């Protein structure tokens, strides 16, 4: 819904939603181009006197929505990775955010965030065939999983969103 979108600045937007099981989600959209595109969707919705960004027909096209989620996931993964590379102290901050979110949701973090996620078998071959990495940073992947895609597992995020 349009009312669930909060502009932080010219290149940052927070989108609030309630997901499965009543989990309160916040998706962070970053980048001047992405924010400008979102403003276009909001403007169109307002002109159509619609509370929602997408029409019912658009929302029924899963490929389009999945593509948008995958692009947002990939952009955020790379931004988090870059952030941690530029300032190694940020890694501990991301880990703490992940732990706090698991605690807030009453879940137990079972993954070892210090161990890279390595694709194997068919998924490894598929990634290599399209020029994608076969090793992923688990902290960046889990951050994307929790705060962008609202999953609790890195394997789902990596296989269905980052390797696409």
PLM region spans:
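C-terminal catalytic core of Y-nucleophile DNA break-rejoin enzymes
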Residues: 19-40, 50-72
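Short, basic/aromatic-rich helical patch in the C-terminal catalytic core of site-specific tyrosine
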Residues: 65-81, 145-146, 157
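Short acidic alpha-helical/loop segments enriched in Asp/Glu that coordinate divalent cations
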Residues: 47-56, 86-91
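Short, charged phosphate-coordinating catalytic segments
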Residues: 1-11, 157
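C-terminal/domain-terminus segments
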Residues: 37-42, 159-164
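Hydrophobic core segments within long, regular secondary-structure runs in both alpha-
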Residues: 2, 35, 142-146
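Short, polar N-cap/turn motifs at the start of nucleic acid-interacting alpha helices
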Residues: 83-160
């Amino acid at each position: 819904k349009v009312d669930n979108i909060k502009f932080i600045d010219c290149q940052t937007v927070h989108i609030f939603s309630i997901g499965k099981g009543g989990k309160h989600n916040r998706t962070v959209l970053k980048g001047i181009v992405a924010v400008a595109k979102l403003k276009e969707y909001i403007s169109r919705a307002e002109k159509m006197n619609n509370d929602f960004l997408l029409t019912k027909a658009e929302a029924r096209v899963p490929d389009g929505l999945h593509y948008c989620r995958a692009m947002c996931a990939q952009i955020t993964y790379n931004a988090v990775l870059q952030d941690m590379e530029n300032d190694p102290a940020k890694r501990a901050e991301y880990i703490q955010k992940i732990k706090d979110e698991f605690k807030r949701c009453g879940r137990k973090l079972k993954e070892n965030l210090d161990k890279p996620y390595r694709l194997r078998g068919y998924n490894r071959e598929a990634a290599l065939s399209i020029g994608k990495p076969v090793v992923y940073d688990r902290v960046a992947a889990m951050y994307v999983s929790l705060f962008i895609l609202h999953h609790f597992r890195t394997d789902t995020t990596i296989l269905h969103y980052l390797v696409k």
